[in-house]
Amino acid sequence: MNRRTLLKTAGAAGMLACLPGKPTAFAAEGKSGGDATSVKTDIYRLKLRHTWTTTMSSSTYRDVLYVHYDHGGISGVGEGAPIVRYKEDAKGAQAAVNSVLPMLDSSDPTQFEKVISEVFARVPGQWAGKAAIDIALMDWMGKKLGIPLYEYFGLDQKDAPVTDFSIGIDTPAITREKVKEAAAFPILKIKVGLDTDEQTIAAVRSVSDKPLRVDANEGWTDREVAARKIDWLSKQNVQFVEQPMPADRIDDLRWLHERASLPLMGDESCRHPADIPKLVGVFDALNFKLDKTGGMTQTYMMIQMARALGFKTMLGCMVSSSCSITAAAHLSPLVDYADLDGNLLIANDPYRGVTVKDGQLILPNRPGLGLLPA
């Protein structure tokens, strides 16, 4: 099912009837189809400050894809961070983007919805590659209009939420050091999902009493064990538990939701617009990531769908540079929670964009993404 068919189907079901109109690119004056277009891709290796470990993987670096879109004298840049969970990598994302370069070269970027829908129709999977194209075109459009992207989406930068800071799975000693390094952040997100979960939380609690958000990354496979862990976490000043069990265990997740003593948030369970209505009664909140959904425009629509169905919402991220994190931050005034710290986990960020002061996201007010070279 393509994007337009899905939107029509959802509308017929009444799911989108109460949503505000999706921003479109038709606000740009004039046509740009006659101007020269150049689209280039490159892979960049991000070096992590600490080894990053979850139940999914462990790494000291992450390769990301950049898409550079130039048209009519205006340049846009987008980033995609491929997700190992979905068997994506940077080379695959680059090949996917390169496969639609002729279409992008001949398209009018002011017809934004048409271009992105065509990309989605032509490229199977490779959501990070799609996100890189989408973000580059959005950056271009904001610069074309001379406005920051939060303004393009009709949002108020003052409504941007506080972001947490993520602590990956590690030894108790290193966990304590990571928590101390995150002293400026009022909320911490703790990765769990192993047999050492209680030691991890104990290590955090030995040096901090801050509110925690706990992410199991599908790591708990026994629902009874998950329920007991959540009950224990409810006494540890935890706000919610993210993706406690595998995404395909919907019946077990629903059972757990009925008994959980903390709110549950879905992440891996929520990838596409059609997933959202199926998760009513399974989760209290949903986590959206540009690399998982395919970019800013799809994420905007999915957040609005989730809100209409009564979910709390969060914008999360992969390990990324300030390009992708700033793109997500421009949408953050829409959501209840933010986990936008991927750029703070790396040592070689090539860009400057969104900044953080005591956990508060501060959006750039320059046109487009508002990026500057590092």
Each model region followed by its residue ranges:
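Conserved, mostly hydrophobic/aromatic
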Residues: 67, 73, 133, 146, ...
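Glycine-enriched alpha-helix->loop->beta-strand junction motifs that scaffold or abut catalytic
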Residues: 184-186, 208-210, 232-238, 257-264, ...
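C-terminal segment of N-terminal export signals and the immediately downstream linker at the start
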Residues: 21-55, 60, 70
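Catalytic alpha/beta core domains of metabolic enzymes, predominantly
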Residues: 252, 270-340
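Flexible C-terminal active-site loop/helix
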Residues: 8, 14, 37-46, 64, ...
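Metal-dependent enolase-superfamily TIM-barrel catalytic cores that perform enediolate-based chemistry
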Residues: 151-260
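N-terminal export signals
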Residues: 5-27
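Metal- or metallocofactor-binding catalytic centers and their adjacent structured scaffolds
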Residues: 33-41, 69-70, 75-144
